[in-house]
């Protein structure tokens, strides 16, 4: 009887330690995830196809996107990054 009580106490202590470590890891993940990185230019879907066919540049000051279609502008990615570098 005494051995089973000691084993039960050890299991409870180990479980509490594991829960504490898990909560500590979740807290550090929340601190890291609070900083969201938004890339300046991203490839997205602009037409009705399921293919990413344009590049958009997000302007945080005016909260709007400038987009260039790959069909109209073959160098859409370069245009997007050039436009973003002008804003800095």
Curated annotation (Swiss-Prot):
Protein keywords: Disulfide bond, Signal
GO BP terms: suspensor development
Highest rank taxon of the organism: Eukaryota
Signal peptide per UniProt: 1-22
Disulfide bridges in this chain: 41-56, 54-80, 57-67
Keyword flag Signal: yes
One Pfam family matching this protein: ESF1
Tissue expression summary: Expressed in stems, leaves and flowers.
Family, similarity comment: Belongs to the MEG family.
Protein name (database record): EMBRYO SURROUNDING FACTOR 1-like protein 3
Organism, scientific name: Arabidopsis thaliana (Mouse-ear cress)
């Amino acid at each position: 009887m005494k051995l089973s009580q000691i084993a039960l106490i050890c299991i409870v202590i180990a479980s509490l330690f594991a829960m504490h470590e898990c909560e500590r890891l979740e807290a550090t993940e929340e601190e890291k995830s609070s900083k969201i990185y938004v890339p300046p230019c991203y490839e997205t879907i602009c037409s009705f196809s399921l293919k990413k066919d344009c590049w958009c540049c997000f302007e945080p000051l005016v909260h709007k996107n400038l987009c260039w279609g790959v069909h109209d502008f073959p160098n859409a990615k370069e245009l997007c990054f050039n436009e973003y570098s002008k804003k800095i």
